[in-house]
Amino acid sequence: MPTADGKFGVGIVGTGWCAAAHLRAFAGNPYTRVVLMCGRNEQRARRKLKDFGAEVADVSFTRKYDDLLSAKDVDIIAISTPNHLHAEQAIQAAQAGKHFVLEKPTGLDVRELAKIGTAVRRAQVRTIVSFVLHYNPFLKFAYWLRESGRLGAIRYVRCQYLSRILESYPGWSWLKTARSGRSHLLAAGCHAVDALRWCSGLEPTAVSAYHTQFTKGYQWPTSIVVNLQLGRRAIGQVVSSTDYMMPYTFGVELMGDRATLRDDTIFWKDQPIDLDELRQANPFPEVTLKPGRALDGSSMIQIDCEMPASGNVRSHPFQGEIDELVNCIRQNRESHLNVFDAQKTMEVCLAADRSATNNGRTVKLPLIKQTGD
């Protein structure tokens, strides 16, 4: 039930930097107002959220998640707690009739994924999962470029999530554990799996993976390489690691039978891409296209826009995510990033971890044979 001012009431569970990002995004939406937050210690929670840039002076506080579930003025719940709590809290939110935004990973095993899907399907609530890079200008352009047919039929895709995460990372105390962090794909690299699926438009049908560990302090392998079969002919690869001595890197490569997108560059061989035509067709004013030269002197197109260049959530496009969820609620329609789509990404991650644990044995997908959306 909307609040007295006609806005959707929002409840937040979790008090870390993702919760702060959700708070800022809901504050930036004209149809929502955060009314209640849930955490373990009120003074500490308010201080942390303020330090992360969120204004919470007018937001009530509770230590009980049940209070969010039963509150009549809470229509939407934002779940940004440690990973092992996500599934149960999402299921409870759906059963209480609350729409929700859920941080990744949605679930840590097949059973959790299936239970989330069942609860949401029965409740018919609207959901969105925080694969926020869908709202990054570069990834939006990459998706559009492939969808427009300018790359041709996709033959190979590679996405990389490389981020050096150590003790200074917010949430380190639980992220490093096998119970909550679980694996690098589930804790972080699922963003790369999601990007591979979304940007390529292809669904993995089988995976084979290997993992290893170099960085101390983690209770799980810190690097994994995943090889994927994409339909009948295309292949792909995901690399997810916290071991490399380099800045945060989120790489996207889409290689088609006409042209190739490799991060911020478009290449071709036989069929040149007309830069003027591409500029006119480009639907994103924040994306600029420039002529360039490859190392061999051949022509290429340079993409100039905000790239996914930081693991700090303050720079991530949460506003687009929250705006989409609210629009879906207002218009009674599904989000393209609902829990059913996210389930497919999480199944790839679980299959890859299963393969790596079994010395690269191929695992077929999907893991859950019947899904509904």
Region roles according to the model:
Residues 1-54:
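N-terminal Rossmann-like dinucleotide-binding module
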Residues 58-119, 317:
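Beta-loop-alpha module in the N-terminal Rossmann-like domain of NAD(P)-dependent dehydrogenases
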Residues 133-218, 224-225, 359:
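Predominantly a Rossmann-like dinucleotide-binding segment in NAD(P)-dependent oxidoreductases
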Residues 152-156, 354-373:
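C-terminal capping/lid region of NAD(P)-dependent oxidoreductase domains
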Residues 79, 102-103, 127-129, 238, ...:
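Hydrophobic residues in well-ordered beta-strands that form the structural core
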Residues 132, 253, 257-336, 364, ...:
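C-terminal glycine/acidic-rich active-site capping loop/insertion
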